[in-house]
């Protein structure tokens, strides 16, 4: 089964053994970060460093002309993508460019009007608002530029839609604020100026909606169905505008380049895998495939099956398996997880993450990639 692994460019750049180590696992594809959120990561095998800390940014040299007049522009973290790509391709490994789109602390902090503002008025600087025209333009320019990166064979878009409340950083102390069930979704609903305009256009009073959302989040009263319908409709429309603009920009910049979107069939999903109807997302002019977060073996098969049922025939459905024990994965069961995902309708696999994996995790990835029989 077609299997690729995630990597960061700093896992490869400066480590002459990295590409051979990845190829030695039996992997022939790597999804390599070209635009990523702020991160602190281990680099267990690198000869220069063990812990890498990076702010949100891009890992290639942008074209200044491409960004002329843009309200939002990415910062360059380090231009290591090109060298990492060349090293991997030299070892016979194809490279997919991996972009994180609406999860960006730097831009959300600098341009708070483009970040999510919850029903209480709190701004989430890590979460760019999918309903913002400036964010749509930023996302489209980013994806179009990345589509032209030399040496890549495909593009993967993470967080290409609604981000939200959940965000593991900043010494997080929010574990008790979001009740189970709809709590995280309620805290993810945006009431920035753009979203308020969208609710108003749908015939609702934004202030009234915000009061209802606050009451529901505080456990005072359930959110009325009519209010939920307005919110769901406006948010779905905004997400589709963003994804549609991004995909159109990629098609114009690099016709024929395969594009996969990290998504979830639950329309209220937010975060790295935001909610989209697979039938729409991969319909005419849409993405070539969906990447699913199958990190929980208990729910993974159902997630894949629901997506496969809703997606158009021929859609690529990639199941991402968590291969790192230190991140909560179960590497010993990777082969069984892969079999279950395939039986449910997955057409290919991703393993997260070959750069973060310890030697035991890498051994499990190697076993997974062994030819059957």
Model features per residue range: what roles?
Residues 27, 31-76:
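Aromatic-lined carbohydrate-binding/catalytic grooves of carbohydrate-active enzymes
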Residues 286-301, 320-373:
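Substrate-binding cleft of secreted/luminal carbohydrate-active enzymes
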Residues 3-7, 28-33, 95-99, 153-157, ...:
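Hydrophobic faces of well-ordered beta-strands that scaffold small-molecule active sites
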Residues 16-47, 145-154, 279-291, 343-348:
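Catalytic domains of carbohydrate-active enzymes, especially glycoside hydrolases
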Residues 11-24, 133-146, 269-285, 302-304, ...:
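Short, acidic/polar
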Residues 4-12, 61-79, 122-137, 228-238, ...:
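The substrate-binding groove and active-site-proximal loops of carbohydrate-active enzymes
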Residues 6, 96-147:
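Active-site-adjacent "subsite" loops/lids of carbohydrate-active enzymes
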Residues 122-253, 258-283:
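Polysaccharide-binding and catalytic clefts of secreted carbohydrate-active enzymes
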């Amino acid at each position: 089964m077609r299997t690729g692994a995630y990597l960061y460019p700093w896992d490869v750049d400066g480590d002459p053994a990295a590409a051979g180590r990845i190829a030695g696992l039996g992997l022939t594809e790597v999804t390599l970060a070209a635009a990523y959120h702020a991160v602190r990561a281990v680099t267990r095998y690198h000869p220069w460093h063990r812990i890498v800390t990076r702010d949100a940014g891009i890992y290639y040299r942008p074209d200044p002309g491409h960004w002329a007049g843009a309200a939002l522009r990415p910062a360059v973290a380090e231009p290591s993508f090109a060298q990492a790509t060349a090293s991997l391709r030299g070892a016979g490994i194809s490279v997919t460019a991996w972009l994180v789109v609406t999860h960006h602390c730097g831009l959300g902090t600098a341009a708070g009007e483009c970040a999510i503002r919850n029903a209480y008025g709190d701004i989430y600087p890590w979460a760019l608002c999918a309903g913002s025209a400036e964010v749509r333009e930023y996302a489209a320019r980013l994806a179009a530029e990345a589509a032209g990166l030399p040496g890549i064979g495909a593009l993967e878009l993470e967080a290409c839609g609604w981000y939200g409340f959940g965000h593991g950083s900043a010494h997080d102390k929010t574990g008790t604020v979001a009740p189970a069930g709809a709590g995280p979704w309620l805290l993810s609903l945006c009431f920035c100026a753009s979203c308020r305009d969208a609710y108003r256009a749908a015939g609702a009073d934004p202030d009234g909606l915000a009061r209802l959302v606050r009451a529901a989040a505080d456990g005072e009263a359930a959110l009325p169905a009519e209010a939920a319908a307005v919110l769901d409709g406006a948010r779905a429309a905004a997400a589709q505008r963003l994804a549609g603009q991004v995909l159109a920009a990629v098609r114009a910049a690099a016709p024929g380049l395969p594009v996969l979107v990290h998504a979830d069939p639950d329309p209220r999903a937010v975060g790295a895998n935001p909610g989209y109807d697979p039938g729409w997302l991969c319909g005419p002019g849409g993405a070539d495939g969906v990447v699913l977060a199958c990190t929980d073996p208990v729910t993974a098969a159902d997630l894949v099956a629901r997506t496969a049922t809703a997606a158009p025939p021929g859609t690529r459905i990639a199941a991402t398996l968590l291969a790192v024990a230190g991140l909560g994965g179960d590497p010993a069961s990777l082969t069984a997880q892969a079999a279950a995902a395939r039986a449910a309708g997955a057409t290919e696999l991703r393993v997260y993450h070959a750069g973060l994996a310890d030697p035991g995790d890498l051994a499990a990835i190697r076993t997974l990639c062994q030819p059957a029989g």
